[in-house]
């Protein structure tokens, strides 16, 4: 895609939405070129008509048909042509995705606009049908729009005259004319925007702004105030108005750039909202002046009549107060159409041939008809052209044949657009200059040369050299592109050749030269054809002005008759003929040489191709031979592989059978082992059950004995408690008796004192002493007052004395007066307590003897013998309250007490027991405690023998338990080894490492075996510690403290100091029990431990000491 050189910065801003529809390029567009012989002038605003101006370009007709009938296509992503040109740099290759776009066109399209819009145009373009946009306009602007000034004040506005006599206010400033006065070129009379003709305008040209009514892009027209172009025999006339009616945005009423929406039946923005696939779904043109019924009659199949005249009267002046602005502008369009019809009638009188009046099946002045589709329109145009102008095609061919050599390229490009559409033309009249009275037969007329034959290029063929140096091909370019996109040419070193004799290039080079997406899109360097001189015939007369250069343009009708221009050149023509012949001979000679060289080259190429073909045949034969050998080798290899595979399968089958037999043998062996293990386990379970039953019976007997002892202990405790309670009651009774005796003594003293006082009072008063009872005043209350007069005759005194004498005695008075029992003395109390303590001690001795007997018979008892000396020791005298409930200690629940443990340690240390003689508590209790001392001494003497027998029994039981545990655990690992013999072997070993090595040699070195050995060593240490056996070389635990040396050892050691050569005898070590210390090593929470700080609280200050 190449860029457009005439683009301006404002082109993108003034983008017209109508360019979104697919349009075909044409020469009559803006910026197109106008051919005028050798003088080619580029029209800026209005494109000219090629081929002498008599023929309208076929691309223009096609573009007109496409613009009218093509449906608008709405895309999700729309890109303007200007935007695509900005994004794509010059010389770049377009992407493949761009070709698939709906609006893509490979040919260059002209720009829509190069001039910025005015303020009114921008307002109307943004919202052209909005009442809001109209409300923003002023009254003058609305009047201008009603007259067509908003869209008609552009390129076609004349500087002198406007519609309805309006003044040019707020319009575009016209640029200066590009016209240059030359004697051989017609000039326009007005600059851009007015006049009959524009730049390079003449009777033939339709210049910029003049002569073209409603141009293709809407630029200019006489309806905007400019005078019409001069009508002559070559002007388009009525045909141009009919042709303009086909353009979208054009038509007879088109004004300004892009056409007016008032004169057009379609609005591009509104048309895009309808379904493009439904021909009936089209916008409808509403005539504001017509009624609803009239507008419905004008519609046919959903299409509005384009360019049709209104049914309302056009003679009436528009009323601005009655009709809207767009309706008022319609009257101006109608008046413009009437002016065009008048101009067309004048032009028909001057034309040399009748105009085309029915080329699109319409009549001048009648209402326009509507085609159903594009095919309908093309058929109508073709029929009209064939019926009305059959001889014009031959004249058109003659004119095209007389064109210069440079013309066919443009003709071909234009004829490819609509090849089957015949276009009516206006042939030129050569009789105006060939049949001149003065120059008839003497003018030089060059012989028309036939156009250069169009040689169709052969399709491009590609070859490539594969990695085996074999040339592959030929392949078409499309196939190579497909393979490249599919990813077959990934190797950039692959060599590719274009054509038979092209140069080999790698894929990487082609990517760098032509792009990574299309490396095969490039042109081959072809030698340009040699120029051929035209044949010049001998002239019959002198030739004026050498019009050969203008022969192809048919401009003779527009040029005047040359006068008095004669030039006789007879000798000169002969020289030209001679020179021409010489040049022709040289050319023929060169052609012959070239033909000979070409023949030789072809022969050499044929030989080379033959050799290459033979070489390829030989290479193919060698390749086939190699392939056959490879196939034979592969077959032999496959046979060997098959044999090896079969042999391997047989070997695998044998191995599977062997493994199966081994697995079966292993299963049988495992079942036998399991059966043996099950039998052993059964026997072991029976032994364990028997042992458990025995143990259960022993435990039950022990439990019964323990319960019996506990019951007896509870009975003894209850008896002791009752004795204590009775003693307390007796003491309380004695205290109460003492208190009562003291009270009686007090009452007696008070009674005696009262009697003495009464006697004293009677003696002093000389009266009879009143009789007073001996009852206690504290219990009887205060005595009655004796009459102070003391007369016996008083009745009150007599009755009172009688009542006192005969008062009944209180119940407790008899008890007080009863004789009291004598109290026990302190000696009697002590004797009674000693008697009770003796009885209690005898009971405890009997209980202890029974307990020792039960400990000897019980195998589960451990520390029962240690409490034997507890009851043998004599106790000092104490009160009955000292016999607490803890006097009995159960060896099964509480274990040996601290005193029993200390006594046992003392008995082990001394060879013979010593009899403890307790101190006498009191002289009176010495004789009473003697029998108790004797019994305690007897128990202490007999205790060592009993403990020794018990100890031996415990060691044997612990060893048996350890052996049973070892055998049970060892058989879990292996049942083939005699575990009892192994136990006896390792029990004599002191080193734990040796024990571990022996056990692991029979089993394995797994983690479970090591744990088993460690547990065995720990249990052995615990058993030896419990049995009192010292472990001299046991390094797994801390060393034990050495026992204190005995008297015999100390004596021997002192005596051994005399003999220097004698070896010192090692002292026997002894394991000490922690209970001997009488305390535990753990920290107590209720006392201060090491490392703690004792904070002494400060004493409060006594305020009295200040």
Swiss-Prot record:
Annotated GO CC locations: cytosol
PROSITE patterns attached to this UniProt entry: GYF (PS50829)
State a single Pfam family of this protein: GYF
Instruction: Give me the stretches of Polar residues compositional bias.
Output: 1-17, 162-180, 229-243, 306-322, 786-801
- Where are the stretches annotated Disordered? 1-50, 160-370, 383-434, 778-811, 909-928, 1026-1076, 1087-1106
Q: List the CDD domains hit by this protein, alphabetically.
A: ATP-synt_Fo_b (cd06503), GYF (cd00072)
Q: Where is the GYF domain?
A: 459-508
- What InterPro entries does UniProt report for this protein, alphabetically? GRB10-interact_GYF, GYF, GYF-like_dom_sf
Coiled-coil region? 584-746
Bias kind Gly residues: ranges: 207-224, 248-261
Alphabetic keyword roster: Coiled coil
**Where are the compositionally biased (Low complexity) regions?**
30-42, 334-353, 390-410, 1046-1057
Name of the protein in question: GYF domain-containing protein gyf-1
Species the sequence originates in: Caenorhabditis elegans
Instruction: Give the encoding gene's name.
Output: gyf-1
